[in-house]
């Protein structure tokens, strides 16, 4: 999470903007709002991970609610940043038509127009292992891009610019 490196990222992003470089950041947005408001002005395009639209379920599975994330996401949109919501599609968490409709309701409410559906994979398992953490998804199969087409269709039918993969 690049935005967790507050001092470094602030100086780094300032420098990039001074050089006229278009800055793209991928983030969970789970940082303090005041810091986010300061740093957002140095970022042109945001890829914003939104793991679940329901704060209770989000907290159950990630350990944190999504209120701070959604506050920062809404702020980025309010200052006219180019924002794409990225949804890591995870089995037994958010990979369902029912949850897709919950995302749609949330995204319409806050003004998201672009969505990337990211198929679940096992790439993160090694990171958990290196950190000595339990990986709760080791027995889950990867989700093929083909399996996301029905969810993509739901988003498209509801007026979103959507693609599978990022």
Per-segment meaning from a language model:
Residues 89-166:
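Auxiliary Fe-S-binding modules of radical SAM enzymes
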Residues 2-123:
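Conserved AdoMet/S-adenosylmethionine-binding subsite of the radical SAM
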